[in-house]
From Swiss-Prot:
Residues given in the record as Mg(2+) binding sites: T26
Reaction(s) this enzyme catalyzes, per UniProt: GTP + H2O = GDP + phosphate + H(+)
Any one GO CC term of the record: cytosol
Name the record gives this protein: Elongation factor Tu
Region annotation (G5) ranges: 179-181
Gene3D superfamilies registered for this protein in UniProt: P-loop containing nucleotide triphosphate hydrolases, Translation factors
InterPro entries: EF-Tu_GTP-bd (IPR041709), EF-Tu_GTPase (IPR050055), EFTu-like_2 (IPR004161), EFTU_2 (IPR033720), G_TR_CS (IPR031157), P-loop_NTPase (IPR027417), Small_GTP-bd (IPR005225), T_Tr_GTP-bd_dom (IPR000795)
Quaternary organization: Monomer.
Residues covered by region (G2): 62-66
Record organism: Leptospira biflexa serovar Patoc (strain Patoc 1 / ATCC 23582 / Paris)
Region G1, residue ranges: 19-26
Length: 401
C-alpha cells in the first residue's frame, strides 16, 4: 500500500504528556485522539488506551525506552504526541531527547494535587529546555459538585507556585479542568469532550509555532578536514541547523580559540551547490584556513551565535548494567569522556553536595568541567563514555563559564 504523503501545509509541533503516575497521562492521550477524531474529523484517528499503554520499546543512543508516538491535528496545526508508560522512561526520554518536545501537557489529578513526580517532571522540563507547559487538571468528575470549583482552584494555585519555582510563568499558564475518562467514553459535557477541545485550543493559542530548523542560525559540526591542493581546506559534516551560502562568513568554534573564515565553495556528493541547508552532508571550502587550524569536534557557525564553554551543569541519566552501562557506581571527581556531536572530550564530574556516589540507573544533576571548551548552549545533548562505550546520557542544563 502506498504511504500517505506527509502534509506540510500546517505548522508541526512536538508535544508530550508529563505528570505523576496514575494521574491519567495515557487516558488523556487516548481522549485527545478520540475527541478530535469525533469532533474535528480530518485525518484524526481514535487511538485506544491499551494501544498507547503497550508502548513498544525503542533504542535511543543505546538506551531502551518505552514510548508511544501518536499524531493528531487541530484546524490550525499538526501534532506529534509522545507518551511514556513508566517514570523511568520519562526521565530517559527527556534527557536523551529521543522525543524533543516543543511543549508539554502537565496532567495533575484534581483529587491529589502535586505529587513527587509532578515536581520532578516540571524540573526535568526546565532542565532539558521544554519551553511551554499547559496544565490539565484531570479527574475533576471525582470531586463532589459543590466542592469542585474550590478544590480545582486550590490545586491550580499549588501548581502555579510549582511552575513559578522552576521558572515557568505560572500566572500566564493555561489551566483546563475536566475528566479524560469521561471524554474517552464520549461524554459531550464541560468535563468531558468539551474540556479536551478547550485544552487543544489552549495549546494552539498559548504555544507559538517553533522556529523551523532551517530558520535557526547556521551550525555544522566538523567531522573531517582535508586540503585540496591549489584550492584550500575543506571541512566536512552534516548541517545541523540553518542555511549556508557561498561567501558567507563563519566562525570556527570550540577546542581552540575562535577564528573566522569565509566559505568560498560548497560541495555535496561531488556537486557544487550555491547553498546548503539543515540535513545536508557537505564539504565547505574555507578561505585562508590551514588544515592544521581546524579539527573534528569544532563547529562552523554563523558569527556571534554560539560560544565555547568548559564548565556547565547537566542533567544526566546513567545506564544500568543491562543497558550496557557500568556494573559499579562512580564517585565525585570521576573522569570519563563526554561525546559532544562528533568528538570525545575528557571532563571531571562534580556531584551535588551530600551525594557520595552515582549508581547505574540513577538520574542526577551534576557539574562538569571539560579539559577543552566546546561550542554549546542549553539543551545540547551528549553521551558519557568510557573507552568508547556509552555509560550515560546527558543534556546541558545551564552554562557556568
Amino acid at each position: 500500500m502506498a504511504k500517505e504523503k506527509f502534509d506540510r501545509s500546517k505548522p508541526h509541533l512536538n508535544i508530550g504528556t508529563i505528570g505523576h503516575v496514575d494521574h491519567g497521562k495515557t487516558t488523556l492521550t487516548a481522549a485527545i485522539t478520540t475527541t478530535l477524531a469525533k469532533l474535528v474529523g480530518g485525518k484524526n484517528k481514535a487511538i485506544a488506551y491499551d494501544q498507547i499503554d503497550n508502548a513498544p520499546e525503542e533504542k535511543a543512543r543505546g538506551i531502551t525506552i518505552a514510548t508511544s508516538h501518536q499524531e493528531y491535528e487541530t484546524p490550525n496545526r499538526h501534532y506529534a504526541h509522545v507518551d511514556c508508560p513508566g517514570h523511568a522512561d520519562y526521565v530517559k526520554n527527556m534527557i536523551t531527547g529521543a522525543a524533543q518536545m516543543d511543549a508539554a501537557i502537565l496532567v495533575v489529578s484534581a483529587t491529589d494535587g502535586a505529587m513527587p513526580q509532578t515536581k520532578e517532571h516540571i524540573l526535568l522540563a526546565r532542565q532539558v529546555g521544554v519551553p511551554y507547559i499547559v496544565v490539565y487538571l484531570n479527574k475533576a468528575d471525582m470531586l463532589a459538585a459543590d466542592e469542585r470549583d474550590d478544590m480545582v482552584e486550590m490545586v491550580k494555585e499549588e501548581i502555579k507556585d510549582l511552575l513559578n519555582k522552576y521558572n515557568f510563568p505560572g500566572d500566564k499558564t493555561p489551566f483546563i479542568s475536566g475528566s479524560a475518562l469521561k471524554a474517552l467514553e464520549g461524554e459531550d459535557s464541560d468535563l468531558g469532550m468539551k474540556s479536551i477541545l478547550k485544552l487543544m485550543e489552549a495549546v494552539d493559542t498559548y504555544v507559538p509555532n517553533p522556529t523551523r530548523i532551517v530558520d535557526k542560525p547556521f551550525l555544522m559540526p566538523v567531522e573531517d578536514v582535508f586540503s585540496i591542493t591549489g584550492r584550500g581546506t575543506v571541512a566536512t559534516g552534516r548541517v545541523e541547523q540553518g542555511v549556508l551560502k557561498i561567501n558567507d562568513e563563519i566562525e570556527i568554534v570550540g577546542i581552540r580559540d575562535t577564528t573566522k573564515s569565509v566559505v568560498t565553495g560548497i560541495e555535496m556528493f561531488r556537486k557544487l551547490l550555491d547553498q546548503a541547508e539543515a540535513g545536508d552532508n557537505i564539504g565547505a571550502l574555507l578561505r585562508g584556513t590551514k588544515k592544521e587550524d581546524i579539527e573534528r569536534g569544532q563547529v562552523l557557525a554563523k558569527p556571534g551565535t554560539i560560544t565555547p564553554h568548559r564548565k556547565f551543569k547537566a542533567e544526566v541519566y546513567v545506564l544500568t548494567k543491562d543497558e550496557g552501562g557500568r556494573h559499579t557506581p562512580f564517585f565525585n571527581n570521576y573522569r570519563p569522556q563526554f561525546y559532544f556531536r562528533t568528538t570525545d572530550i575528557t571532563g571531571v564530574c562534580n556531584l551535588p553536595g551530600g551525594m557520595e556516589m552515582v549508581m547505574p540507573g540513577d538520574n542526577v544533576t551534576m557539574s562538569i568541567e571539560l579539559i577543552h571548551p566546546i561550542a554549546m548552549d542549553q539543551g545540547l545533548k551528549f553521551a558519557i563514555r568510557e573507552g568508547g562505550r556509552t555509560i550515560g546520557s546527558g543534556v546541558v542544563a545551564e552554562i557556568v563559564e
